[in-house]
Design a protein with these regions (language model features):
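N-terminal Rossmann-like NAD(P)+-binding subdomain of aldehyde/semialdehyde dehydrogenases
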Residues: 1-115
Length: 117
């Protein structure tokens, strides 16, 4: 079972400030396949504040730097493709091949299109 209870805010994995947890049920087995946090207003406010604070420096990032970051992201994303396909398969109850092609692999295509803009 995947245990995903933290949020990635301002460059770090942080525990929720408010909110609750929710079980994710695999519809093919009706078993809990993950436990996730449901953030509250304070969590949203913290994420938005971090994004606003990052905007100034990010807006000064060159196209070449952004492309390099996207390429690194794509490398990591593709290295975890099977893991993502498995998680998607569990949360949707979909066959693994469908989860891989319709969900996990489509992210690679979207990222490649951004790299080539």
């Amino acid at each position: 079972m995947i245990d995903t209870k933290k949020f990635y805010i301002n460059g770090a994995w942080v525990a929720p400030l408010t909110g609750s947890e929710m079980d994710v049920i695999d519809p093919s087995t009706e078993q809990v396949c993950a436990v996730i946090s449901i953030g509250g207003q304070a969590d949203t406010d913290a994420a938005v504040a971090a994004a606003k604070a990052a905007l100034d420096s990010w807006s000064q990032t060159s196209k070449a730097q952004r492309v390099a970051l996207l390429k690194k992201f794509l490398e990591i994303y593709q290295s975890r493709n099977e893991e993502m396909g498995y998680a998607i398969s569990q949360e949707m109850g979909a066959p693994i091949d469908m989860a891989l092609t319709s969900q996990a692999e489509s992210g690679s295509g979207h990222t490649l299109s951004l790299i080539h803009i």
